Every structure is written in structure tokens, then in C-alpha cells.
């Protein structure tokens, strides 16, 4: 679509005022730290390569299971409420109509921004998991190309799976608190469903 990169840049500039990117990176920093700490505390002193690689796999799996499956939908729900409500809150719909920007293009732009933030959060999670594994000697890091690629594909899947929650948020068009609660409950239900499926 013509003009889409400019619209995406505008959405990022609007979110920049709310300090969203530092918050996303901070969240992606804290969770891998906790994950690697749990992995390190469970190590038994085995120095074999297979065991150390297994500990890194354990940290990576925990990061995917909790950092992405549980936390990322909450993050995307909050971002969706900010992206879709800011025109309402700032009373800038009349400015958009004056440009004009097609509603479809505006929605696609906001969804692409959600996807970009999702990938930023995911890549930061993997990076910090790798860094903390090195720092705390909590395993042997390996297979990074595959792990980064798989995490990105996983993140895209989570973003797509979160779209029903985004639709609810936009449709009800209520307060930020209600949007966050909807995102939280949707995230918990999705995570619980994944746990049940993995156990069967």
C-alpha cells in the first residue's frame, strides 16, 4: 500500500511519547533474568556438553512458554488499546479525515505496528536469555539461528492468535483498564489451553 511506511512511522512517533519501547525492553529484560536464575539454581554440577545445552534449552523453553505465550498477549492488548484509542482520546479523527486516510489502511498500519512491537519484544527476550546464560554460566548457548528464527515465527503466531482480543478491545471501545483486563484474561485462557494440549 502506498504511504504505509509513513503511516507506520507516524504511529511509532505517537507511541514514542508514551515511552512504550523502553517499557517493552524492560519487560523483556526482567523475565529472562528470572528464567535464567531458575535454570541456574537447578543445575547439579554436570559439566557435559549435552547437559549444559539442555539447560539452555530449558531456559529457552521457559522464555517461550511464559515470556511469550503468557505475557506477550497482555502486552499486545495494552498496545492495541493505545493504538486504537489515541485518536479518540486526542480528538484527532477530524484531522485524519482531512488528509484523508482510508480506514482500512489505518487499521492495517496499526496491526503492523503491533506485529513489529511483538517481534521487538521477542528478539529482546531471546537476546537477554542468551546474554544472561553467558553471564551466569547457566548452560551452553548453541543453535542461535534456529532459536531466533523459531521465536520470531512463534511470535507472529501469537500476534495472529491475539487478534480476537484486539477485536474485542476495539469493538467495546471502553477504558484502558477494561482493555488490559480483557487482554489479561485472554492471555491466561490461551496459556491454560496450551498447557492442557501439551499434557495430552
Model-derived features: positions:
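Aromatic- and glycine-rich beta-strand/loop motifs that create alpha-glucan
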Residues: 1-28, 174
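Helix-loop-helix units of permease transmembrane domains in multi-pass membrane transporters
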Residues: 81-115
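Transmembrane alpha-helix boundary/hinge residues in polytopic small-molecule transporters
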Residues: 79, 91-92, 163, 180
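Secretory targeting signals
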Residues: 28-76, 108-172
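Hydrophobic alpha-helical elements at and bordering transmembrane segments
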Residues: 8-15, 106-107, 148, 152
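Transmembrane helix segments
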Residues: 34-41, 172-200
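Generic transmembrane alpha-helix motif of multi-pass integral membrane proteins
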Residues: 11, 15, 97, 163-174
